[in-house]
């Protein structure tokens, strides 16, 4: 079995990444946005060694860049149990131009419930972060977490 078959992938927040990995992302972005920029100049601009850049450049990608083809992800929303809460969430999903693939609402316990949504964002230009922020702004939504995505 090829070693590539055994690779695991993780979703990790940017603030816990090593500085060299973050700089690698910045260098990649600079190179993508300026075709005249050389790798030498880009790593120099961000104070990153070329060896670190070459080590990480094919191993780190922003989440949204990796899901451009599929654009499917699953969120869990923690909500207060009020009449019409699910309708409010579905209305927001529609306004964000997202398609619902699956949906599950838990039985409320102590006036709290969860709504788990698998979504397709092919028709939306929003990033996952923008979707999460929009859903967090709905009244009575107390928390929104990304729990999976298709890559």
Curated annotation (Swiss-Prot):
Disulfide bonds: none
Record domain ACT: where: 74-149
InterPro entries with a match to the protein in the record: ACT-like_dom_sf, ACT_dom, UPF0735_ACT_dom-cont
Coiled-coil segments on the chain, per record: none
Family, per entry: Belongs to the UPF0735 family.
Protein name: UPF0735 ACT domain-containing protein SERP1207
Organism: Staphylococcus epidermidis (strain ATCC 35984 / DSM 28319 / BCRC 17069 / CCUG 31568 / BM 3577 / RP62A)
